[in-house]
Amino acid sequence: MPAVKKRKKAEPVTLNNKSNGKGFFSKNMFIVLAFVIPFVLMTAAFGVMKVSPFGDNQILVTDLWHQYYPFLADMQEKLKHGESLFWSWTQGGGVNYFALMSYYLMSPLNFLTVFLPSEWLREFLMFSVVIKVACASMFMAIFLRSLFKKNDFSLVIFGCSFGFCAFFMGYYWNTIWLDTVCITPLVALGTVKLFTEGKFRLYIVSLALSLLTNYYIGLFACIFVLLSFIAYNIVKWDGIKKFATNILRTGIYSLIAIGLTAFFLLPAFFGLQNTNASGATFPTTFAINIGSTNDLMGVLEAIRKILSNFITFAAPAIKEADALPNIACGTLSLVLGILFFTSKKISLKEKIVDGCLIGFMIISCIIRQLDYIWHGFHFTNMIPYRFSYLISFVLVVMAFRAFMLLESSSCWDVILAALFVALVIIFGIGTQETYALVGTAVIAAVICVLLFLYTKRIVPKQVLLIVFGVIIIGESAAAGYIGVKTTTVTGTYDYPRGEENTAQVIDYMDSLESNTTEMWRAEMTSTQTLNDAALNHYNGLSMFNSMANVDMTVLWG
């Protein structure tokens, strides 16, 4: 990591300074653009696919259709009517709603639904995805500016590289994960500030928010902090005494962050003990994912396939259990990520450590024992390699570091990067679509030619910024469209179906049971989702969620 520069003393703010507003915008213009541009691009992607309010489609697919939307509709009903958030009768004959919220509903944006009509809930979900993609880009820009003391359009370029990475575009329908993923740059920034300056507030708040918004993805944030701790202390080794101090300080502040979320994590933990997932066991024999054989050749085959998934324009994995990890984050990040390893101004130790960090995460996608540990000592049910966004994050940071140090790169460094990208494209033959390979090759060629000319001092860095900006905005727009098209959309015309009739039946059952002490239960003869009771707000027996009590599941057969 670069040495932290001593900051100048801030000038006092006075009421007479009329340029304060303009000064603030001027200072933060690129941070604002890092939010606005992704917001516009992602909204446009949904608009092209005619997602409401731009048409008659909606983003509700797979678990967003069957789980997240019904649960959010149920939560909105509870918030509007002041009902208990500790228990719900709309699922499984009665469930621990606090535990269910801890996994599915703790996005801060969800609490805004109390101010919205229920008819706007689908549009709210769509715009919440847009906001989270934009926030991921903005938080990445904040991280890069704070760490590398850079404030130009490159913040927007590399912010978009993370915000439109394949993980976001493939799993945006998994709205419950997005908050923690988009907070990742803030967790990383808090970690850096803790290590380098001893400042702990951002670290505690960001890590606590990561765990609170989704404890499952928050686990990956905790593992990443551990890996960052190891990497930092190797690169910046300053003796055993300093190392012990770092361990103590990081441990204390991590416990504080976890403690702040204990009121939610403990109910979730005890709830998980009663789920079907609690009986998982550690694999005892060596086995790999992706590769066809459980040996060295299988591992090499898996590495080749994973590297091919850095290809731009490739359709992201959506839910397939045998899919490759979503790790693509733009052609520019791929090219500059290679230049990181050839830069003469980056120490060999830092190159080795960062290379090992990415290598370890790639190997974790392959070796099932590591995959099992990453996912909380469980194997995933569909949607594999859920930590893969961290690979994209590290690569984007490495690429930005290389971009800052382009002056030290030679034409031979650029040629080496071009050869490696060509190798990645070759790896993709037979695995990726032809249009994706050709598109990546063309853009990589443009980038490498420009970098070559820059090393020869033929084109200035301002030209690089302009062209790279156009490239990344184009790639981001394409990634958004490909992501929405691959995920697919559904029609709004019959979801939920028969609302008025269902409401009338529920009112009728309430009137029949109004003078009794017993609580009625009901179920649909023809279901639309796997959580119709939550969707329509009646006392139901069926349920489908990861926090379901296994005994109740067995009871209902």
Model-derived regions: residue spans:
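Transmembrane alpha-helical segments
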Residues: 136-144, 183-195, 223-231, 334-341, ...
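Start-transfer (signal-anchor) and selected internal transmembrane alpha helices
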Residues: 1-49, 249, 449, 454, ...
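Active-site lumenal/periplasmic loops and adjacent helix-entry segments of GT-C-fold
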Residues: 45-148, 152-185, 209, 213, ...
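Periplasmic/ER-lumenal interhelical loops and adjacent helix-loop junctions
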Residues: 62, 66-79, 83, 108, ...
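Soluble catalytic regions of membrane-associated enzymes that act on cell-envelope
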Residues: 115, 434, 461-557
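Contiguous transmembrane helix-bundle modules in multi-pass membrane proteins
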Residues: 197-198, 217, 352-372, 377-501
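Membrane-interface helix-loop-helix junctions at transmembrane boundaries of multi-pass membrane enzymes
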Residues: 238-248, 339-369
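Membrane-embedded helix bundles of polyisoprenyl
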Residues: 38-39, 130-146, 153-235, 246-269, ...
